Design a protein with these regions (language model features):
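N-terminal beta-strand motif that seeds the catalytic metal site of vicinal oxygen chelate
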Residues: 1-19, 74-76, 130-135
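Helix-adjacent hinge/juxtasegments
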Residues: 66-77
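Short, conserved charged micro-motifs
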Residues: 20-21, 83-88
Length: 135
């Protein structure tokens, strides 16, 4: 039987400091924090997705996840329903350094405009808007 997947439910992000990472995603990207599981793990929720935060050094048998637990190797693109200039202004207000952008890119749904920064672990964070021009 052949099938296709429908959407992404969650992903696991490896981080050096769960508290610092969770606070950054809450403050900068407006995500909601949630504790889950018997071990009271930390997740970040947004839209219909979530990011589970796995601390570096957590026992492999406690997490069913990637073979290598390395912080700072992620490249994540998030969609925002605001203009790119608003993203730039918000990142500046949060004290987050912009690495690149606004720049035109091709997303899953077509042309978009992206602004790039890094989270506390060095993961590349792309914040994109489906607007036709960088302004």
């Amino acid at each position: 039987m052949r099938f296709t997947v429908d959407r992404l439910d969650h992903l696991v992000l490896h981080c050096a400091d769960v508290e610092k990472t969770a606070s950054w995603y809450q403050r900068v990207l407006g995500m909601d924090r949630e504790a889950f599981g018997d071990e009271r793990r930390t997740a970040l929720k947004f839209g219909g997705q979530k990011i589970n935060l796995r601390p570096i050094g957590a026992a492999a048998e406690d997490w069913r996840t990637s073979a290598q637990a390395v912080a700072g190797t992620g490249d994540l693109c998030f969609i925002a329903a605001v203009r790119p200039d608003d993203v730039v202004g918000h990142l500046h207000q949060c004290g987050v350094m912009i690495e690149s952008g606004p720049a035109s890119r091709e997303g899953a749904l077509g042309p978009m405009v992206s602004v790039y920064c890094r989270d506390p672990d060095g993961n590349l964070i792309e914040i994109s808007s489906y607007f036709n021009e960088p302004g």
